[in-house]
Amino acid sequence: MLSFIFLVFAVIHFGIWLWGWKLWAETGRPVALLVVLIGSTLLFYDNLRIGMGRFIGEGDLLYALSVPAFAWHWSLLPLLVIAAGSVARLAGLPWAQHKLVMGAFCVVAVVLSAIDIPKIFAMELHLACLDDTVRYTTTVREAQLCSPTDQVISSNDFPIVAILTNVIVLGVGIALWIQRRWAWLAVGSGLMFVAAGALGQGRYALPISNLGEICITLGFIVTCAHYARLKQRSAGNVPQPIGAPTGAIEKGRA
């Protein structure tokens, strides 16, 4: 059953990703949305390899399929920091219009990438099982042991990059909520924060966290497309509807 849930997550992520590219083309190809889409390219793949693990089984093939998922996560996750700064700029937030501010977002992203990228070259994955799922991962809890002879694999590696990235995106989302009355990014990143934090410590931490990734990705895509459309309208070039609600949460406009 859990494998099926991850396969559903994979389909949802792929659908969201394709929809995002459609919105990107329709709304003037905003840089903010481009960065989000590049950063989220392999979210569907990460869920797919977990969902398919039970069918592939333990071995070199599943291990090899797992490596790109971790390499992608460690190298491209900080792109969301740049996306957060870009969407703040796109939304017309005064403090985000300064080049130094956008430069600061980029510097933070580079620093965070520099923290995580070395992990790619020291990657060591271990077999883990949960319900009917079979996957390779960096740490293995007692509840994820595949056999009585397997050992718990712990790590002192604190996910500082993921936490700081989420906090920065949430901060921009809250700023948009307060200054522009647009809550989608705050809600999406807030759900991601809760899913990976308060709800991400139990037996089913992984599927809950991956559900949070759907929320933050949706929040980013809808927000980027919304403000790109407003920018086109202000320039007198009104695009076709993007298929996302524009008034349910937002009561004002940029």
What name fits each language-model region?
Residues 77, 167-253:
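C-terminal transmembrane-bundle signature of multipass membrane proteins
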Residues 41-48, 108-118, 189-202:
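Aromatic-anchored segments of alpha-helical transmembrane domains
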